[in-house]
């Protein structure tokens, strides 16, 4: 496929008997990706889909420069207009979370887990919705008490190809040793 204009896809991962973690690519994404696919997303349509899915919060895992490069610099204001809370916790593409992510994450993890416990929905996204998105989805499962190997398997079952790199997988497995 060379033109990415189809409906915005959110893969859903159940947690806490009713909470849902959503995994997706970057809403409103435009331009060519590394594989030569042309993305022509509508920010308004994608955010409407996120709203209709029932997201209480969205966590962007791309850097600010990536967000702008992807044509999604207006995401925070589009979400705010729909009363959806936006968090920005960037991770470098292909990498595991670093100390900057950990500092930001420590301020929001409890809020996200509380939303999930309240049977609410939290959407995670990076550029393609695979590496960083899958890593953080698995991290939320681990924080909810799921052992790392099972968390990885559950995330990969709902969104194949997630947690793309060995460094991301090692990061998750090390969380259980910490």
Language model region names:
Residues 1-123, 128, 136-178:
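Cys-dependent protein tyrosine phosphatase-like superfamily
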Residues 133:
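Ser/Thr-glycine-rich phosphate-binding loops at phosphate-binding pockets of nucleotides
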